[in-house]
A protein has these predicted regions:
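P-loop NTP-binding core
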Residues: 1-261
Length: 261
């Protein structure tokens, strides 16, 4: 049965999607069966998987959510799950924006995504859900189905300010909608260990959350190879396997699975 892990943040531009993508491939490299779900209308994860025009995809997560909203049957997984280089994925498109608007007016809308992903648990070891950088209805849906959430943070004060809001939301969802939900950990991304700011933020995180919330040992460094790999739609394992960011994502996968050496 799959562990459903949401990768989220309160602020955009923190390397969340790149982390979802590369974590999925790092888990697959370990022999895990992985499904990545793009649950963001910007469809950045979909683009990472090499789909140049998400709007042309016949069945996306937006279509599936609309099926659920209109009490229609969700199609067979073979109709909406795509695969690339050993990782399965469900693409997204701007259609998810229309779904977001409808969710706000729908009773019990928090569990719409759960109705799609729960039947897929038995097919995978890990389901990674990449979400939009906000605390709206889509994010609540993802938190309601997730077993764990990885919170991506980059070493900037504004990103830190949003972190507390995000954690409060996770706790509310846990108490009201999903008592399984746990914070897997805080992931520092786009970090230049040589800068004073990165050191200060890392120390601040440790002081604030030590003993309460795990801070992953794997710190994702700021490197141009991450951006280049996204541009070429090649995960770091393929594009730059010896790069320090690739090694960090491999280490993260080991932390997530508990297979640390």
């Amino acid at each position: 049965m799959a562990r459903i892990i949401m990768c989220g943040s309160f602020k955009g531009g923190v390397g969340k999607t790149a982390s979802s993508w590369n974590l999925a491939y790092s888990l697959a490299e370990m022999g895990k069966r992985v499904l990545a779900v793009d649950f963001d209308s910007q469809a950045n994860l979909t683009t990472c998987f090499g789909i140049e025009d998400p709007a042309a995809v016949p069945v996306t997560i937006g279509h599936l959510m609309m099926n659920r909203l209109e009490d229609e049957e969700v199609p067979d997984p073979s109709e909406f799950i795509q695969s690339r280089n050993g990782v399965d994925f469900i693409p997204s498109s701007m259609m998810l924006s229309a779904v977001d608007s409808k969710l706000r007016m729908e009773m019990g809308s928090e569990k719409m995504l759960a109705g799609i992903l729960e039947p897929l648990r038995e097919l995978y070891d890990y389901i990674i859900v990449d979400t939009c950088p906000s605390l709206g209805t889509l994010t609540i849906n993802a938190l309601t189905v997730a077993d764990e959430v990885i919170i991506a943070v980059n070493p900037q004060l504004l990103a830190m300010m949003g972190l507390q809001d995000f954690i409060r939301t996770v706790k509310k969802v846990r108490s009201r909608l999903n008592d399984r939900l746990q914070i897997a950990g805080i992931l520092l991304t786009m970090c230049d260990a040589r800068t004073n700011l990165c050191k200060v933020i890392t120390e601040q995180l440790t002081e604030t959350f030590d003993g309460q919330i795990r801070i992953f040992k794997s710190i994702i460094p700021n490197t141009v190879k991450v951006g280049e790999s996204i541009y070429y739609s090649e995960p770091l394992l393929e594009y730059a396997p010896e790069n320090k960011a690739c090694k960090a994502y491999r280490n993260l996968a080991e932390e997530v699975t508990g297979d640390e050496s």
